[in-house]
């Protein structure tokens, strides 16, 4: 694995995690 694929994987994880936090926040958790 090169640094580009690692950076993309980390970016997708952070994006999906922040998106789920926004959804949970709007649902009134």
Swiss-Prot record:
Its main location: plastid. It is found in: Plastid, Chloroplast thylakoid membrane. It comes from the Eukaryota. SUPFAM superfamilies: PetN subunit of the cytochrome b6f complex. Keywords: Chloroplast, Electron transport, Membrane, Photosynthesis, Plastid, Thylakoid, Transmembrane, Transmembrane helix, Transport. The keyword Metal-binding does not apply. The 4 large subunits of the cytochrome b6-f complex are cytochrome b6, subunit IV (17 kDa polypeptide, PetD), cytochrome f and the Rieske protein, while the 4 small subunits are PetG, PetL, PetM and PetN. The complex functions as a dimer. Component of the cytochrome b6-f complex, which mediates electron transfer between photosystem II (PSII) and photosystem I (PSI), cyclic electron flow around PSI, and state transitions. This is Cytochrome b6-f complex subunit 8. It comes from Phaseolus vulgaris. The gene is petN.
């Amino acid at each position: 694995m090169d640094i580009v694929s690692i950076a993309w994987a980390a970016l997708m994880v952070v994006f999906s995690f922040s998106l789920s936090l926004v959804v949970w926040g709007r649902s009134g958790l």
